[in-house]
Amino acid sequence: VAQIVNGKSLKPRSGGAPKQIVLLLHGFGSSGADMIALAPEWQDTLPDALFLAPHAPQRCGIIGDGYQWWGLSGRSPSALAAGAASAAPAIDAFIDRKLNQYRLSESNLALVGFSQGTMMALHVGLRRPRAVAAVVGYSGILTDCTTLAHTDFAKPPVLLIHGTADPVVPVSALHRAESELKRLGVEVTTHVSHCLGHSVDPAGLRLGRDFITHELLRSTPGIR
């Protein structure tokens, strides 16, 4: 299993020990440095959260100095599902390590992804032994979930956000993911940003913040 050993992080604004972890998973050819930029916008409502934005284990040979969770050799549903499955063990091991380090559980963890990172957040979030508090996916795809249909799998609340003008991952991916998740019994909320390309806008940033704040505080009563 490839090991995640580096990346960017932002400690709790409160100065105390983390009471929640927000794991930020970047897109293809990007890095944790891009994703950690979301964290300052969310610290006001989650002052006790540790924000972690690891670099994917593989270097991306296509885009500059970026990283990839897996190489995008194909975009067929089977290729994407296989890629996500191959990358998941490194993320699961990283999560296990951090939860153990800070003596927290899945109920204290939110997963946030962008593009390929959304594929990973959804793949991992739906397959953890216990449900995480929340999954937020920006501009991504839900990889094949047929193997989950007849299993008693974790069903964390999911928020999907996408731009109508996304030239990389069409917004139709959001609608397909919403339909599939609902069919599987997952609580899913969606937001479409009109005229937005393959990026995150201020409205999406606010919605993501409010969603993970609500779910993290709901799943860890007594923390305010």
Language-model region placement:
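Serine-hydrolase catalytic machinery in alpha/beta-hydrolase-like enzymes
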Residues: A2-N108
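Short, proline-enriched alpha-helix->beta-strand connector loops that line the catalytic pocket
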Residues: K19-Q20, E106-S107, F153-V158, L184-E187
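Short N-terminal helix/helix-N-cap motif within the alpha/beta-hydrolase-1
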Residues: G32-A33, T146, D201
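Short alpha-helix in the alpha/beta-hydrolase fold that links the catalytic acid
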Residues: A37-A39, P170-E180
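Alpha/beta-hydrolase-fold catalytic nucleophile elbow
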Residues: P54-H55, V112, V136-S139, I161, ...
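Primarily recognizes the serine-hydrolase "nucleophile elbow" in alpha/beta-hydrolase
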Residues: L99, S107-A154
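Short beta-strand/loop motif that positions the catalytic acidic residue
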Residues: L159-H162, D166
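C-terminal catalytic histidine-bearing segment of alpha/beta-hydrolase fold enzymes
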Residues: H175-R224
